[in-house]
A protein has these predicted regions:
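NAD(P)+-binding Rossmann beta1-loop-alpha1 motif at the extreme N-terminus of oxidoreductases
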Residues: 1-43
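Glycine/serine-rich loop-strand microenvironments at binding/catalytic pocket rims
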Residues: 10, 16-23, 27, 68-86, ...
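Conserved N-terminal Rossmann-fold NAD(P) cofactor-binding segment
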Residues: 25, 31-79, 85-93, 133-146
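Rossmann-like NAD(P)(H) cofactor-binding subdomain of soluble oxidoreductases
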Residues: 88-155
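Short, intrinsically disordered, charge-balanced linker/junction segments flanking boundaries
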Residues: 158-160
Length: 160
């Protein structure tokens, strides 16, 4: 199985690394080129016990890859986890702009079935918004491709 994790912050990097540790091929995607280049060099931006060794081991083994280009890996993966930030909006609600941008990118570039899993902590109803956003992009491309959307929000306490 091959998966992509969009977002290499605490949730995305730990999730992707743990999947790769289980033998799954993982591509971690982030828009910050410097972050991706640092990860390729073994510079881990967060602290979690054992994470640095796991990243190194799985990157060296080829099970863990890093890129800034989600489009390039969509044809190879079966599952895309969206673990992007949801900063508070002016009214305190979760700002979904990054979550929906991931959905737009998937809809604009997917060519086969994919399961989209939202890991970001988001309000009820977000899965339907993600599904509608992807479907709108597919409709604009005038193609029909099956896909599913699931929610697997992360609630955690970051390491000390």
């Amino acid at each position: 199985m091959k998966i992509a994790i969009v977002g290499t912050g605490y949730v995305g990097l730990v999730t992707g690394t743990c999947f790769s540790e289980m033998g799954i091929d993982v591509t971690c995607v982030d828009v910050q080129e410097s972050k991706i280049e640092n990860l390729k060099k073994g510079v881990i931006p967060i602290y979690e016990p054992g994470l640095e060794d796991m990243v190194h081991r799985n990157y060296t083994a080829g099970r863990l890859k890093f890129t800034t280009d989600l489009e390039e890996c969509l044809d190879d993966v079966e599952v895309v986890f969206s673990a992007v930030g949801t900063p508070p909006d002016e009214d305190g609600s979760a700002d979904l702009k990054y979550v929906l941008e991931v959905a737009r990118t998937i809809g604009r570039n997917m060519n086969k079935y994919v399961l989209v899993v939202t890991k970001s902590t988001v309000p009820v109803g977000t899965a339907q918004k993600v599904k509608s956003t992807i479907q709108k992009e597919l409709d604009e491309r005038n193609i029909q491709i099956e896909f599913d959307v699931a929610s697997n929000p992360e609630f955690l306490k970051e390491g000390d």
